[in-house]
Regions:
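Loop/turn-to-beta-strand initiation segments
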Residues: 74-80, 94-97, 115-124
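Glycine-rich P-loop/Walker A and Walker A-like loops and their local beta1-loop-alpha1 context
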Residues: 1-34, 38-41, 47
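C-terminal, charge/polar-rich interaction regions
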Residues: 183-259
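ASCE P-loop NTPase helicase motor core
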Residues: 107-172
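A short acidic (Asp/Glu
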Residues: 15-22, 45-54, 108-111, 131-135
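Conserved P-loop NTPase "ATPase switch" module shared by AAA+ and STAND
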Residues: 87-108
Length: 259
């Protein structure tokens, strides 16, 4: 089941916003597990277009208390990035339809990490602002119903093998908070940098999130490590010798899997 939707917009595109609102209400009215619809953006100043549809006074009230409208069976709330993040510290059940208003991929990726989000509908402010997000998730366009071409999972079998092995050796903690896990991750990134020169940081981030279940913020840290090396910078930690042994093992595993 697809749970990611988008509309590309340039500036205050009321048609695109209307399509997002329609989709949000449609989902809320048909999915019994949905508890509410949340309009979400950076600050309260970013809800002017939403106010044109729901009313200024209503939007101001919905920051503190959800409201119901005839068109939607579930309560509707407005939330800024800061207030919604605080709410999510105490809630972890996916029951929200979140409409991200006038945002780009970088900030919508953060919403993906919230366990409260069952559906995400993203509306951009620039026409290419959501390219990375919609490609990662093969999001559906609410304006025409077409599916975005999904970002290909890295076709390099060695990279897939490396990331899967790395995840296991990190005991599937899926973050770098523990020293030993961080060291393991850095070793793998050093090896990928040395022996897989065609791999991009986004290849790593997308695969960790969509296939191995990492949170975006943690996967992005791993991608950033490779980015640093690609740019000629460095970082502390991780094994720097005997990396060819890792690479040789990946090749052997990849051949066995292919056979």
């Amino acid at each position: 089941m697809n749970n990611k939707y988008y509309a590309d917009a340039y500036g205050p595109d009321t048609k695109a916003l209307a399509a997002c609102i329609k989709k949000a209400f449609e989902i809320a009215n048909t999915d019994d597990e949905v508890a509410r619809v949340v309009f979400y953006s950076y600050t309260k100043n970013n809800f002017m277009q939403v106010s044109k549809f729901l009313g200024d006074d209503n939007v101001n009230q919905m920051f503190s208390r959800p409201m119901k409208f005839r068109e939607c069976k579930k309560p509707i709330k407005c939330a800024t990035a800061i207030t919604y993040k605080k709410e999510c510290e105490y809630r972890d059940t996916p029951k929200d339809v979140i409409v991200c208003c006038h945002m780009d991929s970088k900030d919508v990726f953060k919403v993906d990490d919230y366990r409260t989000a069952k559906y995400v509908i993203a509306l951009s402010w620039t026409l290419d602002g959501l390219n990375a997000w919609k490609a990662r998730w093969k999001a559906e366009n609410v304006l025409d119903g077409r599916m975005e071409e999904k970002a290909d999972a890295p076709k390099n079998a060695l990279l897939l093998t490396a990331l899967q092995e790395m995840d296991v050796r990190m005991y599937e903690t899926k973050n770098l908070s523990h020293f030993d896990d961080a060291e393991t991750c850095k070793t793998y990134i050093r090896c990928i940098h040395k022996y897989l020169p065609d791999v991009k940081p986004s290849d790593i981030t997308d695969y960790l999130v969509t296939e191995l279940g990492w949170e975006n913020k943690n996967a992005a840290e791993v991608g950033e490590l490779l980015q640093r090396l690609r740019e000629g910078r460095s970082f502390r930690g991780g094994q720097k010798t005997h990396l060819k042994e890792y690479y040789s093992r990946w090749k052997e595993k990849a051949v066995n899997c292919a056979g």
